[in-house]
Design a protein with these regions (language model features):
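A short alpha-helical cap/connector motif
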Residues: 1-157
Length: 157
């Protein structure tokens, strides 16, 4: 079974609005790896059922992906209510962490048992187009915190 053709295009593509092509590229990339157990790490988590075009629905899609192909998926969010919402929507295969993302990523980067990352999806700080510096700075801190788990070929989104 092909995730992009059999699941993503049928269940998610038309819900995601302008984000759909980016997500399609992410899953096409994962499938091109031909890897049995890819590792996906996300910051920022699903917050609502309704906002497919804007809010954190990647958590649900990444969960579907690892349920089909196997692998590891971790999502980090600082807000307990977001974690609780996501727990009600994803399978037990997803690892959800309630923490400041930079602190959690730093811990993961030092965990010898945690695999190298295939897709790093940084979405924990919403971008303000009128003032992009705070979001950019936060995501750079996240990237530096997880850097030891980045490998040649890691897709960073």
């Amino acid at each position: 079974m092909n995730f992009v053709i059999d699941i993503f295009n049928k269940s998610y593509y038309f819900k995601l609005g302008k984000r759909r092509d980016t997500f399609q590229k992410i899953f096409e990339y994962l499938e091109s790896l031909d890897k049995k157990n890819p590792t996906i790490l996300e910051t920022g988590i699903a917050r609502t059922n309704e906002n497919w075009e804007g809010d954190g629905m990647s958590t649900l899609i990444f969960d579907d992906y690892i349920n089909l192909v196997g692998g590891n998926f971790t999502s980090i969010d600082i807000e307990p209510s977001n974690i609780n919402f996501a727990k009600s929507k994803v399978s037990s295969k997803s690892n959800l962490i309630c923490s400041d993302s930079v602190i959690a990523l730093h811990k993961i980067s030092r965990d010898k048992a945690y695999p190298m990352i295939d897709v790093l999806y940084l979405d924990s700080f919403d971008l303000d187009w009128n003032n992009p510096i705070p979001s950019s700075f936060h995501h750079m801190k996240e990237l530096l915190a997880i850097y030891p788990k980045i490998q040649k070929g890691t897709l960073i989104v």
